[in-house]
Regions:
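Active-site bordering "gate/hinge" segments
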Residues: 9-265
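Conserved small/polar residues in nucleotide/adenosyl-binding loops
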Residues: 269
């Protein structure tokens, strides 16, 4: 006689997935070590997630966690209404927070969430002037990020304008919910054992990049669908992807999710 096993419902609630996401960002993404200070950069719309990240950072042993809030509407108001000739003025303290954290051996996590069409009607020269000014002042910090001198991480979260571009047939509320579902699925935050799954995934990426580095292929040849492209690879090239290490030995994953491995092509003259 057969029998039917009734299994418990393993579906996680939204709050459980969000806590998982924050835990992944801190434990797998940022790799916070005891005693580190942490800077969180977050849009005001993502306050719920940012607060969970703060708590997870303290749970991981952070000594001090600060948040730098961003507001798209405030930024838009400036680009629309500020006088001409004022866009080389910046709030240096916003960049100084990054530089200070890096110089203290700290970690920086940024929650990126913005409406891609936010500045669609704004004078592009105003935006370009502001961006050039900020980039110039951030250069010392950017150099540390690009060379993995500190552990850093980028994650994302839905905001209404962005979500509705992704799901145009849904209401604003439904679009945000659907974008959350997509983010949770892509980051494995919808799984109870999300951290363990990420550890296995990063191990797989490491095996793949080590294999490819050992092969030292001369070129990659892409064919199909009207494409016939050969890309030469640099001598003694190294494949990267997945987790990385700081000079101090802290392992971090700069982007969650991340699925690719990559390398450098040969420079042509």
């Amino acid at each position: 006689r057969g029998c039917v096993a009734i299994l418990p419902d393993m579906t996680l609630s939204f709050d459980e997935k969000l806590r998982n996401y924050a835990r992944l960002a801190v434990r797998v993404g940022l790799g916070v070590k005891p005693g580190q200070r942490v800077l969180v950069q977050a849009p005001v719309e993502t306050a719920q997630l940012a607060r969970l990240v703060v708590r997870e950072a303290y749970a991981a042993g952070a000594s001090f966690v600060d948040v730098r809030w961003d507001d798209d509407d405030v930024q838009l108001a400036r680009f629309e209404l500020a006088p001409d000739g004022t866009f080389e003025q910046i709030s240096r303290w916003r960049v100084d927070a990054e530089i200070e954290t890096a110089e203290a051996g700290g970690a920086v996590i940024a929650i990126r969430a913005t409406n891609p069409n936010l500045l669609g009607g704004v004078d592009p020269e105003r935006v370009a002037t502001h961006q050039r000014t900020v980039a110039a002042y951030r250069r010392p910090y950017t150099a540390q990020v690009m060379t993995n001198r500190l552990n850093w991480n980028l994650i994302s979260a839905p905001v209404s304008g962005w979500a509705q571009l992704m799901f145009p047939d849904a209401s604003a509320e439904q679009a945000v919910a659907q974008q959350w579902d997509a983010i949770f699925a892509a980051t494995r935050a919808d799984q109870a054992d999300a951290v363990e799954r990420w550890e296995a995934h990063l191990g797989d990426l490491k095996r793949r990049r080590d294999l490819l580095t050992g092969k030292q292929y001369a070129a990659l040849h892409f064919q199909g669908g009207g494409t016939d492209l050969t890309v030469g690879l640099a001598d003694d090239h190294v494949w990267g992807g997945g987790a990385a290490d700081t000079p101090g030995g802290i392992t971090f994953t700069a982007n969650i999710p991340t699925e690719e491995v990559w390398t450098a092509d040969r420079k042509s003259t």
